[in-house]
Amino acid sequence: MESSKQNNGMTIVAIGSIPLILTLGNSMLIPILPKMKSELHLSQFQVSLVITVFSLIAAFAIPIVGYLADRFSRKVIIIPCLILYGAGGLLAGFAAGFFDNAYPWVMAGRALQGIGAAGTGPIAMALTGDLFKGAQESKVLGLVEASNGMGKVLSPIIGSLIALLVWYGAFFAFPVFCIISIVLTWIFIKEKKKEKEPPPIGQYAKGLLSVFKHEGRWLFTAYLAGATCLFTLFGILFYLSDVLEKTYDTDGVKKGLILAIPLLVMCVTSYTTGSKIGQKQSLMKKLIVLGLAFMTVSYAALSFIENLVLFISVLVLSSIGSGLVLPCVNSFITGAVGKERRGFVTSLYGSVRFLGVAIGPPIFGRLMQWSRPGMFLSIAGLTLVVGILVMMLIHVKQNNEETKEKEDPKMAGNRLQPAEER
């Protein structure tokens, strides 16, 4: 029994290491972007593409990788993707440090990392749904999101520390972390054997169409809520990284620590939320709406705040909001379909999240040039609209009614569940 618990714990550690690697891909580079801009003589738009290209490539690769993960196995996809991720970091690092025309090669390395990233976080979500059930699944998904958040917390600090040695050193850290995750995944993740052969691609596609026909309205709303959190998060980090150096003359480890504050709050909130929500879908919806309301209030208030301490204090409210939204959205989406198509549906969610990350820095870069108050009021408007959409389009039964559904299947019409179970 003790051995089983220990193995279970190491399985969770192994799964958690996968999205942690994923978050390093962008967050670890954010503190060094101003230095990269000056060293490689780049424009603000060019340096923002270092984040955007990685995320865009990942977004388009994820649905393909998700299908392959459903077709074969999660581990068969995750491990090669982690190898590719590390190799892309090596290419970008050598290019930045030793190539004359470094920028195109850095971008090529980031593109390779994007393809590798496609097989990390989203597949880890599907794997969690495969291995854990019920309230334990929600708790582990909360841990996965917390691991994602912890990666965001640690990576600006790690990036800043490595940059004290050499600014492009962060690229060489990627393969080191990837090797650790590969070893953990190989040893501790034991997938269950498939009970039946995967369906032909035509039948698979038909099943997906059925899922989106029945669940599409709320599913895409949930996708949008998750993407909005990541869009605003990375946009704000991009803005804050630039402002800390230019306005407040803050760089190095101190800058990394400041960037880590809102991320740490989001991480703690994500873990707490995931451990409390269980399978209470009505509670999940309320927390998503509350989280988006917190984000709206925070961003609207930031348009009037100049003082750095007060700015970070108010920004923390938006981090609490993101920490409420993301674990609930994860649980909704992971439970939306059965195992056979879970990889694709969670991967599509991963694509949308990556698109949010991809467009955050360039859009915030443009908004920064336009108007600072206008930038914050615009994103406050976005989070408000998304919150209203969640209230209108995601329908769940109350908790006491969910119990009755077990006795009366006719009541299950609007409850979120796999389409194939209907």
UniProtKB/Swiss-Prot annotation:
Ranges of Basic and acidic residues composition bias in the record: 401-410
Transmembrane stretches, start-end: 12-32, 49-69, 76-96, 169-189, 218-238, 257-277, 287-307, 309-329, 344-364, 374-394
Transport listed as a keyword: yes
GO cellular component: plasma membrane
Positions of region (Disordered): 401-422
Keyword Transmembrane helix: yes
Topological relation to the membrane, as annotated: Multi-pass membrane protein
GO biological process terms held by the UniProt record: transmembrane transport
Pfam families (alphabetical): MFS_1
Compartments, record wording: Cell membrane
Principal subcellular localization: membrane
InterPro entries per record: MFS, MFS_dom, MFS_Efflux_Transporters, MFS_trans_sf, Tet-R_TetA/multi-R_MdtG-like
Matching PROSITE patterns: MFS
Keywords tagged on the record: Cell membrane, Membrane, Transmembrane, Transmembrane helix, Transport
MF terms (GO), sorted A to Z: transmembrane transporter activity
Family stated for the protein in its record: Belongs to the major facilitator superfamily.
Name of this protein: Uncharacterized MFS-type transporter YitG
Source organism per UniProt: Bacillus subtilis (strain 168)
